[in-house]
Each structure stands twice: as C-alpha cells, then as structure tokens.
Amino acid sequence: IVAVVVVSILTSIAVEWVGIYGGWWAQPGAGHAQGVLTHELSWIDTQFTRSLIFSQPVEMARAVITTVYDAVFVATGIASWFDAHSSSGGVSQTIATYGQAGIDVSLVVLVRVFILTLTVPLFVMAAVVGVVDGLVRRDLRKFGAGRESAFIYHHAKRLTGPVFILGWLIYLSVPFSVNPNTFLVPCAALFGLLISVTTGSFKKYL
C-alpha cells in the first residue's frame, strides 16, 4: 500500500507539472492543484460525515492533513519559502509555483488515502458478499452436475489483486477531482464479483 501511495504521489506531481508547463489547466500556476484539494476536502464534508472507522471523520481528516502539512512543509520552512517567492519573478517564482503545486498534489493524495480508509468497510462487505455468493454457487455445482473450470478459477484469482491495486492507483493519481462514490462503488462491486467467481469456481473436492 505504501508503494502504491508513493507511486501515486510521484505520478500526480509529474502530471500536474506537465499540465502547468503545457497550459492544460484553466487556472494559472498552482491554482489547479489548490482547486482540486479544496474540492477533495468538500467530498469528505458532504459524503463522509459518518464512518464505521472514525467517530468524527471530517475533523479527523482535517487534523491529519494539518499535522502532516505543518510537520513536512511548515516546520522545514519549505512553505514559507514558496510563499515568499510566489510573486518574485524569475526562476525563484517558477520554482515556488511548481513546488506549491507539488505540495497541494501531495495533500490531494493524502486526502484520497483517507477517503479510501473510510471506504474499507465497503470493500470488506463486497468481499464477504462475494465469498458467500461463490460458496453457494460452488455447493450447487458440487451437489449437482456442474462442470469445473480451472481456467476461470485461476484467471479470476490472478485478477483479484491487480484490480484492487489498480483501482486504488487510478483513483489516487487522477489529476482532477472525482466523486469517490462514483469511482469506488463500481471498483468494490468488481472486486466482490471477482471474489465470487474465484470462490464459486474453486474445485468441488479438496
């Protein structure tokens, strides 16, 4: 998971910097990254007011983000240097612009990691439903005349992990704000489906 987060941060920063250089974003400079960060925080405020993991997810998210920002960027003087050179002109301003965008993008990934943490129960529920559904279909096949397919079992089993990781990686890395439920609910459904297929196609007799 740590590797996925690190890769997502590096990928997101690279895409953001290329977008700034190429003029892809409607907002100038670091404005695009700041807008995405604000929008991502709004998803927590509006859609994750309750959680099975944290009693106060909104307050917890802001506390975690503030703590990380203060420890990594404020205490080291990085944030103040960027602020001081944000309108100084020349190379210093360019460095400050790209640096501030990198900070904001890193915080966006952190917010999304927190959102993923809040959606862990969703993936657990999808996995449980998938296992139960698969076991029921396996028993029907076991006591009936159903045929086994090692091909389906091995391919479904092999895809389960990559689909889970790839879904997280894409969600963490997209350079624009996306509704978490729009993306993560289908991912959880696909994850549960693969588990169901894997469990249901497991050989009838051990």
Model-assigned labels for residue ranges:
Residues 60-120:
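Individual transmembrane alpha-helix segments
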Residues 1, 99-105, 157-167:
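Short hydrophobic alpha-helical membrane-embedded segments
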Residues 132-188, 193-206:
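Hydrophobic alpha-helical transmembrane segments and adjacent short intramembrane/lumenal linkers
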Residues 14-64:
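Juxtamembrane non-transmembrane segments of integral membrane proteins
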Residues 1, 91-94, 101, 105, ...:
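Extended alpha-helical regions
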Residues 3-7, 99-138, 187, 191:
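Hydrophobic alpha-helical transmembrane segments of integral membrane proteins
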Residues 1-10, 182:
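Alpha-helical transmembrane segments and their helix-start/interface "positive-inside/aromatic belt" motifs
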